[in-house]
Amino acid sequence: MLDLCTGNGSLAVLAALAWPEVQVDAADLSTDALAVARINVEKHGLQERIKLIESDGWQNLPGRYDLILCNPPYVCRQGMEALPAEYRAEPLISLDGGLQGSADGMDFVRHLLAHALEHLNEHGVLLLEIGNEREHFERAFPTLLAYWP
């Protein structure tokens, strides 16, 4: 399985703990985030099961996966302006989904979805966190069949 945009590695660690038979690739663009993820992976003794990969999106991920988890940057422009101070302490790249110019916060998600099938095995599943941006997501991808729990 893949945890894309792993950040501090928490989803990768949780997945490895939940499914002991699974190997996890955990990828992020940020070397700082991967350094924190490495600390968390080592803290839980999961170095043999979680592989940390520096990758800008799909760039360094040639494989296919049964499950891809992703907590991408998805906050829209208006949401970024209204973020509480404690959220602004996070790196901008981990939150701002409009770094390529869109107001809806779906820049990275557009790229992610455009190439997801190239990285999913048949019957594979992609799970995305979208936070409070469901309206923007549905407007950006009106024909995509999405499940909302």
Model features per residue range: what roles?
Residues M1-A82:
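Conserved SAM/SAH cofactor-binding pocket of Class I
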Residues D3-G9, P73, G98-G105, G124, ...:
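Glycine-centered flexibility sites
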Residues A18, P84-Y87, L144:
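Glycine-rich, phosphate-binding/catalytic loops in enzymes
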Residues K51-I53, I93, Y147:
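Structural signal for short hydrophobic segments within the conserved structured cores
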Residues P62, E86, E138-R139:
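Short Asp/Glu-rich motifs
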Residues P73-D107:
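Mobile active-site "lid"/loop adjacent to the S-adenosyl-L-methionine
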Residues S102-P149:
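Conserved Class I SAM-dependent methyltransferase catalytic core
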